[in-house]
């Protein structure tokens, strides 16, 4: 379970299904407002240590968005009082004016006063809906980017001397699918294909930094090497170079 402050008036709390079960809750509990749900909301706010700006601010509005593996709860500060009191409706006429009103005029005046009082609350809800829509778009974009991520990366390294190439090959201990060796314009080029699918996202950059300790990263693509370079080893180049000397 984690909390993120989106703005001065809005918090986003993400609750996993496991967290829900640990607290005796399930998604169906959020479909119909009930005392159990409200108690749960305030309990998790206490547990997550709500920011000071949200303390003692009166009523809070909760908006729940169920997901397949979690529940997102958006919490917004509300300016409306939980119990509306006629004394709070300062725009209402005094008793003498009220006595002269028809029932229709009284109802319209009362509705206007309540509408003015709840305007801030309505705006907060509308703002919350906009925040939720942006969060949805961001999550969808991240999921699409993740799905498009290639599971393999070709690293292409450049060496001025064959001895440097052999020395580098002997330092390689990471797993690779295959490797190739080309020669072009009096330089040696080593391509290394690595499966990154089951590695953390920083792994490709970490691996490249490690390679750069012994070799130069190249701007030349594999397709250029295939077309214009001389193929010295078409597969398992690193393994074969490790056998030298």
UniProtKB/Swiss-Prot annotation:
It holds the Pfam family MecA. One of its GO terms (molecular function) is protein-macromolecule adaptor activity. Transmembrane segments: none annotated. HAMAP family: MecA. The N-terminal domain probably binds unfolded/aggregated proteins; the C-terminal domain interacts with ClpC. Homodimer. Enables the recognition and targeting of unfolded and aggregated proteins to the ClpC protease or to other proteins involved in proteolysis. Belongs to the MecA family. This is Adapter protein MecA. It comes from Streptococcus pneumoniae serotype 2 (strain D39 / NCTC 7466).
């Amino acid at each position: 379970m984690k909390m993120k402050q989106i703005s001065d008036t809005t918090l986003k709390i993400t609750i996993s299904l496991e967290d829900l079960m640990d607290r005796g809750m399930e998604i169906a509990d959020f479909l119909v407002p009930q005392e159990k749900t409200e108690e749960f909301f305030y309990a998790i706010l206490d547990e997550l240590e709500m920011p000071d700006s949200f303390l003692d601010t009166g009523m809070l509005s909760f908006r729940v968005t169920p997901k397949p593996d979690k529940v997102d709860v958006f919490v917004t500060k509300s300016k409306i009082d939980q119990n509306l009191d006629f004394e709070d409706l300062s725009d209402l006429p005094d008793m003498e004016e009220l006595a002269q009103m028809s029932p229709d005029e009284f109802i319209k005046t009362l509705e206007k006063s309540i509408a003015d009082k709840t305007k801030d609350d309505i705006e907060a809800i509308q703002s919350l809906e906009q925040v939720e829509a942006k969060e949805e778009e961001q999550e969808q974009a991240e999921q699409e980017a993740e799905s498009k991520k290639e599971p393999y990366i070709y690293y292409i390294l450049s060496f001025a001397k064959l001895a440097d190439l052999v020395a580098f090959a002997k330092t390689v201990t990471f797993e690779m699918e295959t490797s190739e060796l080309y020669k072009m314009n009096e330089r040696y080029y080593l391509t290394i294909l690595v499966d990154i699918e089951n590695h953390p996202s920083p792994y490709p950059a970490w691996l490249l930094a490690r390679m750069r300790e012994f070799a130069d990263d190249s701007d030349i693509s594999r397709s250029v090497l295939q077309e214009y370079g001389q193929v010295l080893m078409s597969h398992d180049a690193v393994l074969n170079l490790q056998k030298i000397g």
